[in-house]
């Protein structure tokens, strides 16, 4: 099952990629009642807490309560139909977090979170309570006991399942009423695909045995580096390691358990130019264990580079809106493809009255230059020795992760599918993903862009200068790093995207040195932007981040080479009017942070 991030994220038509947007980084630095139609209450167990070894207590309770609910919920008539599908998805995660700011530890904790998402479907796969705008009526979420007490877990599941049935029944009755008065839908696909049950080895629950003391020292030292840069007035260094096991059982017979292990170090810093523009830099390092994160020397070098970059950005000129040639670095290109292309290839975007359906009717048609191919492969845990955040073994509907070739030689082949069918693709391909508390939808995992027209990056730079000269432009742009972006995909908004760069240079055609600039966002429409790609570099780069959409925030990766585009449009960034701090900071000490 996909790694599930246990935190709330508001559903929105904006799709955000990245460790965080600039606004989110700055923020870090600075049920209606239902009638319950109850299943029988579970019988009391004679065994107490810890009577069953993990995961037997949890998995046993899931199996038992699922079977009881399927046999006893509903009366089988039109007013109280029996469920045709029921599933329990449990996220069981232990995490250790250490944070430092201004050279001192501000947080050092270990936490254990166990949540269940219960999905109840009434009607039939052809049409059920999730139809149309009622998709979330199938879902009920709640915390589960952390102890392996089968009685406590069973009672929690019993209560939540009853709530879930009431919610599903309310949605089902609304769907039936609406179908009598609405016009025929353009896409008459079913609401739930038919899939083969999946089983995997049942794994032990998560365990985490880590000494936080060495990491308290490491994050303290890294945070203290920013004291050398008086204009950097906000910083945060956070280390987190998570051990997670996700369980999925369904009335179809699926029974899977998927482990997840991730260690992440995030370094963030904030400054402000004299004109009030906020400036943010962030670096994220990820591995499958703390031992595989970069050593302290490498991290210190990166931290110093961030401080120097912010100092330079404060003095850089604000660039004007631009429409002309540009190079996006590999990381920048990866975010670009994630936002501009990836979201529009998610299955649920191909049906419904609200979606713009940019590529819905273009299967088998060319949508990219013929030298580009795009796949999404969540089965890859790493690439060239670097961890990929978008890796998972089973998705959040219990389907095995699969490589999906989305575009071959520029031609669109398929979409990223959950178990919500669309007219052109009726089956899941293992991309039904969700954050805890959200309904799964088709989402990206590891989006990988490859090119058959790759040149060394020095040659790509020469091609940029030549293209700028051809267009009579005094310079082209080079986007070195990008923080985040979003895409608008609904019909009631422009079919547009915005990508937020952090480091941008003007590359002059007359031989002048490259000039660092600030205050620019990349904007545009997807088809125009994608068809302006002229060539790519010969080295792939990786972007690891978190992406938010209607099914919540999920970990993603995008892999791409640098690319040259003939036309890219930029606009001025929003600029604040707050002054930098008037009072100078206290003098830095000579040590490595507070003890």
What function would you assign to each model-found segment?
Residues 1-13:
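N-terminal secretory signal peptides that target proteins for export/translocation
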Residues 16-33:
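Bacterial N-terminal signal peptides
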Residues 29, 37-394, 399-402, 408-411, ...:
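Active-site bordering "gate/hinge" segments
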Residues 281-283, 417, 518-519:
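Short clusters of small/polar residues that mark proteolytic maturation junctions
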Residues 390, 450-528, 544-550:
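Hydrophobic alpha-helical bundle architecture
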Residues 404-405, 506:
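His/acidic/aromatic-lined binding-pocket segments of jelly-roll/cupin-type domains
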Residues 413-467:
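C-terminal, non-catalytic macromolecule-binding modules
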């Amino acid at each position: 099952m996909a790694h599930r991030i246990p935190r709330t994220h508001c559903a929105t038509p904006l799709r955000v990629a990245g460790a965080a947007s600039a606004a989110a980084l700055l923020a870090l630095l600075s049920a209606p009642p239902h009638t319950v139609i109850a299943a029988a209450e579970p019988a009391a167990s004679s065994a107490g807490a810890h009577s069953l070894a993990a995961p037997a207590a949890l998995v046993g309770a899931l199996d038992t309560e699922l079977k009881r609910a399927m046999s006893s919920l509903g009366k089988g008539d039109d007013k109280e139909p029996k469920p045709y599908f029921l599933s329990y998805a449990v996220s069981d995660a232990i995490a250790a977090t250490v944070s430092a700011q201004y050279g001192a530890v501000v947080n050092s904790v270990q936490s254990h979170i166990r949540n269940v998402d219960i999905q109840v479907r009434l009607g039939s796969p052809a049409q059920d309570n999730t139809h149309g705008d009622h998709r979330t009526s199938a879902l009920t979420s709640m915390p589960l006991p952390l102890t392996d007490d089968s009685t406590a877990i069973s009672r929690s599941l019993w209560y939540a399942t009853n709530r879930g049935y009431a919610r599903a029944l309310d949605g089902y009755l609304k769907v039936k009423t609406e179908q009598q008065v609405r016009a025929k839908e353009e896409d008459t696909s079913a609401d739930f695909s038919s899939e083969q049950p999946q089983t995997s080895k049942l794994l032990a629950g998560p365990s985490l045995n880590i000494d936080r003391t060495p990491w308290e020292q490491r994050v303290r030292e890294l945070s203290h580096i920013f004291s050398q840069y008086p204009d950097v007035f906000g910083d945060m260094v956070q280390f987190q390691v998570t051990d997670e096991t996700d369980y999925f059982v369904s009335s179809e017979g699926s029974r899977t358990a998927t482990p997840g292990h991730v260690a992440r170090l995030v370094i963030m810093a904030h400054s402000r130019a004299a004109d009030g523009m906020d400036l943010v830099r962030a670096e994220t390092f990820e591995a499958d264990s703390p031992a595989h994160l970069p050593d302290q020397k490498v991290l210190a070098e990166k931290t110093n580079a961030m401080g120097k970059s912010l100092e330079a950005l404060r003095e850089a000129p604000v660039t004007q809106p631009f429409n002309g040639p540009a190079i996006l670095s590999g990381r920048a290109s990866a975010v670009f493809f994630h936002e501009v292309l990836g979201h529009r290839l998610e299955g649920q975007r191909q049906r419904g009255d609200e979606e713009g359906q940019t590529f819905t009717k273009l299967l088998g048609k060319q949508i990219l230059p013929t030298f580009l191919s795009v796949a999404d492969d969540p089965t890859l845990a790493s690439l060239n020795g670097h961890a990929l955040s978008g890796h998972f073994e089973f998705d959040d509907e219990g389907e095995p992760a699969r490589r999906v070739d989305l575009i071959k030689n520029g031609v669109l082949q398929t979409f990223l599918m959950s178990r919500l069918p669309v007219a052109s693709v009726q089956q899941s391909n293992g991309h039904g993903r969700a954050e805890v508390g959200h309904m799964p939808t088709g989402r990206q995992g590891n989006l990988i862009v490859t090119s058959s027209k790759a040149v060394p990056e020095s040659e790509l730079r020469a091609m940029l200068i030549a293209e700028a000269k051809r267009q009579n432009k005094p310079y082209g742009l080079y986007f070195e790093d990008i923080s985040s972006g979003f895409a608008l995909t609904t019909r009631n908004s422009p079919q547009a995207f915005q990508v937020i760069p952090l480091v941008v240079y003007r590359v002059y055609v007359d031989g002048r040195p490259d000039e660092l600039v600030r205050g620019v966002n990349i904007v545009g429409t997807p088809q125009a932007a994608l068809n302006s790609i002229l060539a790519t570099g010969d080295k792939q780069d990786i972007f690891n981040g978190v992406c938010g959409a209607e099914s919540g925030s999920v970990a993603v990766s995008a892999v791409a080479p640098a690319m040259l585009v003939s036309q890219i449009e930029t606009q001025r960034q929003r600029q604040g009017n707050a002054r930098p701090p008037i009072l100078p900071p206290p003098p830095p000490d000579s040590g490595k942070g507070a003890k």
